């Protein structure tokens, strides 16, 4: 048996390497048909080291070549390639225009102004000498002369790089060379100085209006244009020609973006992926032709591209994309034998595949399958980007985080991107089905693959399937804004088990299924179309032991010393967030500003270090934040000595990040909405010495796990956050220690190992429960008659919803003459008696178990009726909103009918709202609303089961019930157990038959009979289902009620 883990990206990816001195390669680079990554061993090592963090986020760095910075030499265009050919090799951001440079320069002006703090962007120098510049300057005091533990730099070089002259010349030097070419994507592994890691370039999604254009046809045309190879975007100026540059601009934010999307750092790192470039941006095509328009040349380049990737050496390396927390948890569980079964992965390779020859793709796939147990899902680039970048990132992700897309064109955009999303999900489903073997467990992850569970279920109805959503799940009011909401929900509940990070997300999902699908839900189950889906929550965590070993690393210890020197006698508030609106960056800065204004004595004593990772696609939001940052820093009397805010729009090396956590006096998370923020867990483990307080937004999933020790804050309450900052800085050591112990205990209890164990336990239990309810055999009439004759005391309970026919009345009369026979229905007592008044000895169970007639007398099973007036008021409102609908009030239940409603399209919405309202309002009173055969029933729960237990107790004990009372029964004890008295055993019921079509009313009776047989309290038990059902506790099946009465006729005639 194998565990099949399906995630968007595989944990491994192919890496190609090319000789940069080759002339054919040079032509392809100039044509922008491939992407070249320059060598940077240090950053690749950093990615490997960050395996224990939530994501393995790499960064974009923009700055100066280190030699030019240190020696003060004139800046020249950075050339990578053969000196003989003089070819320039460019990365994704091939050129920086003056406009873009001013944007980057201004973005880093906040900390560049400090003589001890360089710009937060990293240069990539020419050739193989690329290094991350001046990182130690950021962490070191101006007077310090300590080398970075992660770089081999001479003392003189470091000293020179810290000189004030260098910083004075920095801006002027860059201003003189605004079109400098910078590389931004270092490779994972260092190659020789004459080689480079290259990646094929993906096509962009067609920008069409689906209302007037056949999207499928346009996409097909895009894919078939072999003479028009995919091109890299050019930013600012044309590639390869320094004489052509875009005009300068004094405006820092001049570029406008139509669509803003929010990055998902909790789930994946998509910074270094060509597949994930913004599909809404247009190519910057040079005027008057610019690039060659020669079709033969393009075709030749395309052939060269295929030939290049056909012969290039490649290897499989660890991927830095995807859900880092998932990969870490699975790998650790496998290594520690928590998971004993072999694990296979299903996902995409993480690189564009359209430019790769088919045979190369096939070889890579075989290598991944055979050596890495990874099964690639290969789809064309346009479909992948349409599904991931357009639908998942710009529709699903914002909506799941309460940021509903409100662009006027979003509806059309959503419609055509939904088509891509379905296609990618179908690809995943097909791949999983091809890999699956009986007995395997399928575990599907996150919002990219919400349709996969149901797609797999259609092909593999008996498979064991789990689904886990790593991000938040919103309330039904928000989720219902999605156009394809029902399809998504039905896709998710194709799984046996659905998991969430918190109890709140689980509750939202249950309410949404109840409201939008009119599904019957309980505290931890969804019942829909005869399927029962387990819904639980299990917060993910980190591996404490692995992180602790990294904290003892020599580099971390040295960085800690540098940080202490750099900010001696300062209080450090550390923050690390993805750069997007839901992280609450602006509100955080406003709260910090309020704190400093109200407590000016802290201006020279506190430094807030804000680390932002990920791309910024929202210039206006960045401008708003930087305005506040500049305002805060202006509070300082001397910004070169005391800078209240250090704003870094880049990630740090993992060793630096851990060191900063260790030295932090406060860790602040002010997100407006977020899933499980594992940076909090990393901080808690890192702060084992200082026991620093954690300020945590109550709107994060982490707050449900860490609420005992964290200081919970409302990011919308600026004043409260400001007060909480002061409280945390002034907290006594005793309170710090007490709070930290609680936080640390939560981290240990909710670690990655516990998460894996819980999830598989839930998946297995849910599957086993479904197996019990899905094994139904056709009733064998001969055995049924034989067991009937072999027993002495018989109890029959028939659930009959329709008025009886004369044949049914005749057979029931004959059967009840020698047996105990009861009919169960939703009819009222008066209606029931009028229908069955011709059958003298028959017993009746009215209103689904609320009342039982024994020997001509009625007995109450129902206990509570005072809720009915409140429910009637709710239905009054629904009847007004839905003309033609009506409701009926019985003695113990209310039924809401919509079959005559004028607007049938609104019926599901109104029913869903009514059910959600009632079940939420009466959740603690055992009053439940459910839909059966398009009628909404509202009644006390468990009445039919209580009635059955009442009858078994009565007929087994021989005790006459007291009028208008209920025989007391314990639900945990057997309702049929009567002790060891042999004589008394002879008088108890030894044959029970319960029959009817599946419904929430009769299923508990099926389960009861099954349990009594298993406990040997009942000799013969038959649970007979008629009609169709895929999930039931019944063990025998017949075609319909007519077949049932035919068998009863044979039984009585025998």
From Swiss-Prot:
Record's keyword annotation contains Phosphoprotein: yes
GO molecular function, one term: identical protein binding
Keywords of this entry: Cytoplasm, Phosphoprotein
Pfam families: Glyco_transf_20, Trehalose_PPase
GO CC terms of this entry: alpha,alpha-trehalose-phosphate synthase complex (UDP-forming); cytoplasm
Biased composition (Polar residues): 122-132, 170-182
Cellular localization per UniProt: Cytoplasm
UniProt cross-references to InterPro entries, sorted A to Z: Glyco_trans_20 (IPR001830), HAD-like_sf (IPR036412), Trehalose_PPase (IPR003337)
Region annotation Disordered: where it falls in the sequence: 112-133, 155-203, 223-250
Conditions for induction: Repressed by glucose.
Compositionally biased region (Low complexity): 235-249
Region (Glycosyltransferase): 287-778
Gene3D superfamilies linked to this entry: Glycogen Phosphorylase B (3.40.50.2000)
One of the protein's GO biological processes: trehalose biosynthetic process
PTM annotation (Phosphothreonine): residues: 265
Modification Phosphoserine occurs at: 148, 150, 181, 267, 273, 960
Family from the record: In the N-terminal section; belongs to the glycosyltransferase 20 family.
Note, other: Present with 13500 molecules/cell in log phase SD medium.
Reported function: Regulatory subunit of the trehalose synthase complex that catalyzes the production of trehalose from glucose-6-phosphate and UDP-glucose in a two step process. May stabilize the trehalose synthase complex.
Name by which UniProt lists this protein: Trehalose synthase complex regulatory subunit TPS3
Origin species: Saccharomyces cerevisiae (strain ATCC 204508 / S288c)
């Amino acid at each position: 048996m194998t565990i099949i883990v399906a995630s968007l990206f595989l944990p491994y990816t192919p890496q190609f390497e090319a000789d940069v001195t080759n002339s054919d390669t040079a032509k392809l680079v100039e044509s922008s048909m491939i992407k070249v990554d320059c060598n940077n061993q240090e950053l690749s090592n950093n990615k490997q080291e960050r395996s224990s963090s939530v994501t393995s986020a790499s960064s974009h760095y923009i700055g100066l070549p280190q030699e030019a910075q240190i020696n003060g030499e004139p800046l020249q265009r950075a050339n990578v390639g053969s000196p003989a050919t003089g070819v320039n090799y460019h990365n994704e951001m091939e050129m920086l225009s003056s406009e873009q440079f001013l944007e980057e320069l201004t973005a880093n002006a906040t900390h560049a102004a400090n003589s001890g703090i360089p710009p937060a962007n990293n240069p990539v120098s020419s050739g193989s000498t690329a290094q991350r510049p001046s990182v130690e300057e950021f962490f070191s005091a101006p007077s310090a002369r300590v080398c970075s533990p992660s770089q081999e730099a001479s003392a003189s070089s470091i000293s020179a790089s810290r000189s004030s002259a260098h910083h004075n010349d920095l801006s002027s030097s860059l201003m003189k060379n605004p079109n400098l070419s910078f590389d931004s994507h270092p490779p994972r592994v260092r190659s020789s100085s004459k080689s480079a890691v290259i990646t094929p370039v993906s096509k962009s999604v067609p920008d069409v209006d689906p209302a007037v254009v056949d999207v499928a046809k346009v996409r097909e045309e895009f894919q078939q244009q072999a003479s028009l190879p995919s091109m890299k975007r050019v930013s600012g100026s044309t590639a390869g020609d320094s004489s052509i540059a875009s005009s300068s601009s004094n405006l820092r934010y001049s570029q406008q973006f139509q669509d803003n999307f929010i990055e998902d750092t909790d789930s994946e790192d998509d910074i270094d992926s060509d597949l994930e470039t913004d599909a809404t941006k247009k190519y910057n095509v040079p005027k008057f032709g610019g690039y060659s328009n020669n079709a033969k040349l393009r075709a030749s380049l395309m052939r060269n591209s295929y030939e290049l990737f056909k012969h290039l050496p490649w290897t499989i390396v660890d991927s830095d994309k995807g859900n880092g927390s998932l990969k870490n948890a699975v790998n650790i569980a496998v290594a520690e034998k928590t998971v004993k079964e072999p694990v296979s992965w299903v996902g995409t390779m993480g690189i564009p595949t359209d430019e790769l020859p088919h045979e190369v793709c096939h070889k890579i796939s075989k290598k991944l399958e055979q050596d890495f147990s990874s099964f690639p899902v290969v789809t064309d680039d346009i479909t992948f980007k349409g599904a991931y970048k357009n639908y998942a990132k710009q529709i699903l992700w914002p909506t799941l985080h309460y940021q509903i897309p409100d662009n006027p064109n979003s509806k059309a955009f959503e419609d055509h991107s939904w088509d891509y999303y379905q296609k990618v999900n179908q690809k995943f489903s097909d791949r999983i089905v091809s890999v699956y073997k009986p007995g395997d467990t399928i575990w599907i992850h996150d919002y990219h693959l919400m349709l996969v569970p149901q797609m797999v279920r259609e092909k593999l109805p008996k498979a064991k399937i789990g689904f886990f959503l790593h991000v938040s799940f919103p309330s039904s009011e928000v989720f219902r804004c999605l156009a394809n909401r029902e399809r998504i929900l039905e896709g998710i509940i194709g799984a046996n088990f659905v998991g969430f990070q918190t109890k709140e997300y689980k509750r939202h999902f249950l309410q949404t299924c109840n409201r939008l699908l009119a599904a019957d839900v309980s505290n931890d189950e969804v019942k829909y179309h005869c399927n029962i889906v387990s819904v639980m929550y299990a917060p993910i965590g980190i591996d404490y032991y692995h992180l602790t070993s990294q904290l003892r690393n020599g580099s971390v210890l040295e960085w800690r010393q540098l940080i202490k020197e750099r900010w001696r006698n300062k209080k450090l508030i550390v923050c690390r967030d993805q750069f997007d609106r839901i992280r609450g960056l602006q509100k955080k800065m406003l709260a910090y500003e309020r704190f400093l204004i109200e407590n000016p004595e802290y201006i020279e004593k506190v430094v807030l270090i804000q680390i932002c990772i990920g791309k910024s696609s929202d210039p206006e939001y960045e401008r708003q934040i930087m305005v506040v940052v500049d305002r805060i820093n202006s509070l300082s009397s001397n910004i070169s000595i005391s800078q209240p805010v250090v704003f870094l729009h880049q990630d740090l090396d993992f060793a630096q990040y851990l060191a900063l956590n260790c030295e932090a006096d406060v860790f602040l998370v002010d997100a407006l909405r977020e899933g499980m923020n594992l940076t909090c867990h990393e901080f808690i483990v890192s702060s084992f010495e200082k026991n620093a307080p954690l300020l945590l937004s109550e709107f994060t999933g982490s707050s449900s796990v860490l609420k005992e020790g964290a200081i919970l804050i409302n990011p919308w309450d600026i004043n409260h956050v400001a007060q909480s900052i002061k409280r945390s800085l002034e907290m006594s050591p005793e309170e710090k220690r007490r709070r930290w112990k609680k936080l640390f205990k939560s981290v240990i209890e909710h670690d990655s190992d516990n998460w894996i164990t819980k999830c598989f336990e839930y998946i297995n239990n849910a599957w086993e429960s479904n197996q019990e309810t899905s094994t139904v055999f056709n009733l064998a009439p001969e055995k049924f008659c034989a067991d009937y004759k072999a027993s002495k005391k018989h109890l029959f309970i028939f659930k009959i919803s329709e008025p009886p026919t004369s044949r049914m009345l005749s057979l029931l009369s004959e059967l009840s003459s020698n047996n105990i026979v009861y009919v169960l229905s939703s009819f009222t007592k008066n209606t029931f008696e009028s229908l069955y008044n011709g059958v003298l000895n028959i017993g009746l169970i009215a209103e689904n178990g609320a009342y039982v007639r024994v020997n001509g007398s009625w007995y109450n099973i129902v206990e509570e009726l005072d809720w009915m007036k409140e429910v009637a008021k709710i239905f009054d409102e629904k009847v007004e909103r839905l003309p033609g609908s009506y409701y009926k009030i019985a003695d113990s239940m209310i039924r809401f009918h919509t079959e005559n409603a004028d607007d049938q399209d609104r019926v599901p919405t109104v029913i869903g709202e009514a059910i959600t309202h009632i079940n939420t309002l009466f959740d603690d009173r055992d009053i439940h609303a459910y839909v059966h055969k398009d009628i909404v029933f509202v009644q006390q729960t468990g009445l039919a089961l209580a009635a059955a237990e009442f009858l078994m107790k009565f007929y087994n004990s021989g005790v006459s019930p007291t009028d208008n009372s209920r025989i007391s029964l314990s639900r945990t004890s057997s309702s049929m157990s009567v002790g060891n008295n042999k004589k008394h055993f002879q008088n108890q019921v030894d044959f029970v038959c319960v029959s009817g079509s599946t419904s929430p009313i009769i299923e508990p009776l099926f389960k009861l009979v099954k349990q009594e047989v298993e406990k040997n309290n009942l000799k013969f038990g038959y649970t007979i289902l008629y009609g169709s059902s895929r999930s039931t506790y019944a063990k025998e099946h017949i075609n319909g009620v007519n077949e049932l009465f035919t068998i009863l006729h044979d039984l009585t005639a025998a």
